[in-house]
Swiss-Prot record:
It comes from Phoca vitulina. Disulfide bonds join 24-146, 48-134, 83-99, 95-113. InterPro entries: Glyco_hydro_22, Glyco_hydro_22_CS, Glyco_hydro_22_lys, Lysozyme-like_dom_sf. Lysozymes have primarily a bacteriolytic function; those in tissues and body fluids are associated with the monocyte-macrophage system and enhance the activity of immunoagents. This is Lysozyme C. Residues 19-148 form the C-type lysozyme domain. It is found in: Secreted.
Length: 148
């Protein structure tokens, strides 16, 4: 019985963790999904953003008590403006998706929503982590030796 409980807890922890991309695997995936150069943002900048927002983790979430919103997924897309989590007050849902779609191992919907975010006037500057860690920095290390 204890062995089954331990196995169940182990499987639960693996499920909650989600997919943590290897750096070059993510770079290739983002390129394949059309983010390289989208709205003038280099692939290296997208990689830097994903590193600092989620550490390449598809299941990353971060609650923001001030706005009572949550950031979701590999790009930490916010429920106040971009997705619907059913609990954020006055949510806009500009990407027209449930926030749970941003937590999937298949990041196709997360990339589509990130494209929507970066298409707004703030562009890539909409992400605080990008402004803090990537803006005006040499971000080439995030794609180095990835063949992209």
């Amino acid at each position: 019985m204890k062995a089954l409980l331990l196995l169940g807890l182990l499987l639960l922890s693996v499920t909650v963790q989600g997919k943590i991309f290897e750096r070059c695997d993510l770079a290739r995936t983002l390129k394949r999904l059309g983010l390289a150069g989208f709205k003038g943002v280099s692939l290296a900048n997208w990689m830097c953003l994903a590193k600092w927002e989620s550490n390449y983790n598809t299941k990353a979430t971060n609650y923001n008590p001030g706005s009572r919103s949550t950031d979701y997924g590999i790009f930490q897309i916010n429920s106040r403006y971009w997705c619907n989590d059913g609990k954020t007050p006055r949510a806009v849902n500009a990407c027209h998706i449930p926030c749970s779609d941003l937590l999937k191992d298949d990041i196709t919907q997360a990339v589509a929503c990130a494209k929507r975010v970066v298409s707004d006037p703030n562009g890539i500057r909409a992400w605080v982590a990008w402004r803090a860690h990537c803006e005006n920095q040499d971000v080439s290390q995030y794609v180095r030796n990835c063949g992209v």
